[in-house]
Swiss-Prot record:
The keyword Secreted applies. This is Invasin IpaA. Keywords: Actin-binding, Plasmid, Secreted, Virulence. Induction: Synthesis of this immunogen is repressed at 30 degrees Celsius and restored at 37 degrees Celsius. The gene is ipaA. The keyword Transferase does not apply. Gene3D superfamilies: SipA N-terminal domain-like. It comes from Shigella flexneri.
Amino acid sequence: MHNVNNTQAPTFLYKATSPSSTEYSELKSKISDIHSSQTSLKTPASVSEKENFATSFNQKCLDFLFSSSGKEDVLRSIYSNSMNAYAKSEILEFSNVLYSLVHQNGLNFENEKGLQKIVAQYSELIIKDKLSQDSAFGPWSAKNKKLHQLRQNIEHRLALLAQQHTSGEALSLGQKLLNTEVSSFIKNNILAELKLSNETVSSLKLDDLVDAQAKLAFDSLRNQRKNTIDSKGFGIGKLSRDLNTVAVFPELLRKVLNDILEDIKDSHPIQDGLPTPPEDMPDGGPTPGANEKTSQPVIHYHINNDNRTYDNRVFDNRVYDNSYHENPENDAQSPTSQTNDLLSRNGNSLLNPQRALVQKVTSVLPHSISDTVQTFANNSALEKVFNHTPDNSDGIGSDLLTTSSQERSANNSLSRGHRPLNIQNSSTTPPLHPEGVTSSNDNSSDTTKSSASLSHRVASQINKFNSNTDSKVLQTDFLSRNGDTYLTRETIFEASKKVTNSLSNLISLIGTKSGTQERELQEKSKDITKSTTEHRINNKLKVTDANIRNYVTETNADTIDKNHAIYEKAKEVSSALSKVLSKIDDTSAELLTDDISDLKNNNDITAENNNIYKAAKDVTTSLSKVLKNINKD
């Protein structure tokens, strides 16, 4: 087997006789040949070929590796026909570092000799490995562990040589590539596209042609890789990835150069056969309408949503109409709806607690009483009822203030503040009559008559309600002064309170009956459940008893079968023992008759036979007893 370590390195001839000569070595001459063969790197056709630099660079590195080995055709064939992409990428990384290291300035004679040996050994390893699926240039495995170790040693020597030559500067190889080949490639592209002079192109800086953010990301990526190499050491993979990053640098110029081309085309339009007009043209005078400014139309939007108006100029709030208009159709409405309409029309004059009180009363009172209350509510004096406070200065409510406590006690009245509230028993007190309501103004007789008739209607409705409900009711004092009829708030409050108490009693009565019926239903349900449960238990007991009987029957049958089997086995054993005993008896008889003298001399044997006989006999007796017991069972 061919040993890779003993491979003879190819000879690289030097034109100079000393290591300090400035002549190019054969390695560098091969690099020059590769440069001359790839003319596209010097004069690219268009800006669109900038992204081809990385591909060209990789191909150039592979060509250098294959041509330096002396077995270019064999290596190229193996590499091209291999299907192991992982192994091919490892070889490409090795060639990138090798090419960049040879391209460095100041490479001395000893370093070049070391590179020659590295190239020779690496090439022989590729030929021996064949770059198959289990290649040593791929992941480690038990099959390729020897070649894999050789490959790691060669790569380690190349990385160590790169570290020595660059004095530990991790980005030195990439920076050399950026300043030489990448810079020349970019300037040649600019020269070909923009048609600039060589002096102008030479004065350009790469940082001026690259987007600032792109250049910042480019530098940050390389610095991060430098930190990785400094912390974990030089390696072929890390060095090669930095070189690949530098190789894609021309792609950062794509957008910038395209913008420059567009600016040039816009500033210098190409017109076939037409001369370019001079920039300073004479003024031809004012242009009609030049100073007129076209006003842009203002767009206003308008959205109408639930009686609200939103406009980009005006904001209109909801409009409330506080006026009240008589409508004869209101008489056909229900008392509750009439009250709600009244509250909505007089929302600014009635306080919230007062409106809630009217709604509560009209909702709980019977229809006849609510009609009467609603009639008073529709009267124009309602606002005065809820908002008026008696004052001695105008004479209104003076009768209430002058009422003595003795009169209140005599009339069985309750006092809430300064307004009296008379409470009488419906069974002992005659119905209310409006005759007690008088007017203090003789000039308003018509108004007094209408008020009296209205009071009469209220009294009749309340008396009708008292006759239907056997309970205490309220009787209200109506005061008529200056033609206005007042309905005290205490009347409405006490009326609603009374009706509420009646409804509470009715609800409690209904609840009592409902509770009694519910208890009866619960008792019936318990009885039904109890009977159903007992029936189910009896059925379960019957089924269980039948199952037990069946189980006992089956168990007894199984027991009988087992006992019969035991009996048969015991019977067989007993017969066998009987045969043994008979043989022992025969043997003993023969011994006794044939040779008595010998038996006397063999007392020990006879005694032993007797013991065996007794033991067998005891066993037979025991088995006989067992058989008898089994027969009895």
